[in-house]
């Protein structure tokens, strides 16, 4: 906090130097990133730190960017990447998820298809199962069977809609 508020940084004791602090450059700024507190493994920020920060919630990427990211991270075809992104965005749009799916879900599905050499058009049942398993897991933190079954049903409908 001292480097943000007072523009000094405390140095560890025992460095053998006379000065116990370092002046911070007057133009010093910092960018902090964090996940929402409801994510597993995230700890609440200290109030003193939060008082000195501006929080900017970021929205999801646009459709084209999600397709490009999915394709780049998986090396799948553009058509397959578009289909995966459409399914994930369709699920997100329903608003029925505890946590909306992100581009990470797209990447996980795409990489699974690539590694397993699965063609969604020829293996629709396997493709549907992969999408259901990944998206039910990504959108729920409590693991409620009822919620996961509902998500899997929605995903099945979306796969039927977009896998042609």
Where are these regions (language model features)?
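C-terminal regulatory/interaction module of P-loop NTP-utilizing enzymes
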Residues: 1-164
């Amino acid at each position: 906090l001292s480097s943000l508020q007072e523009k000094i940084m405390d140095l560890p004791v025992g460095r053998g130097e006379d000065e116990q602090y370092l002046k911070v450059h007057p133009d010093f700024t910092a960018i902090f990133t964090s996940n929402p507190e409801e994510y597993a493994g995230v700890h609440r920020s200290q109030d003193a730190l939060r008082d000195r920060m501006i929080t900017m919630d970021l929205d999801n990427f646009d459709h084209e960017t999600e397709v490009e990211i999915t394709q780049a991270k998986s090396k799948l075809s553009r058509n397959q990447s578009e289909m995966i992104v459409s399914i994930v965005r369709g699920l997100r749009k329903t608003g029925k998820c505890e946590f909306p799916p992100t581009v990470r879900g797209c990447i996980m599905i795409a990489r699974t298809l690539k590694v397993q050499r699965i063609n969604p058009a020829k293996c629709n049942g396997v493709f549907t199962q992969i999408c259901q398993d990944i998206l039910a897991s990504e959108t729920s933190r409590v693991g409620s069977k009822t919620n996961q079954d509902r998500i899997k049903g929605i995903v099945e409908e979306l796969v039927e809609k977009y896998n042609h």
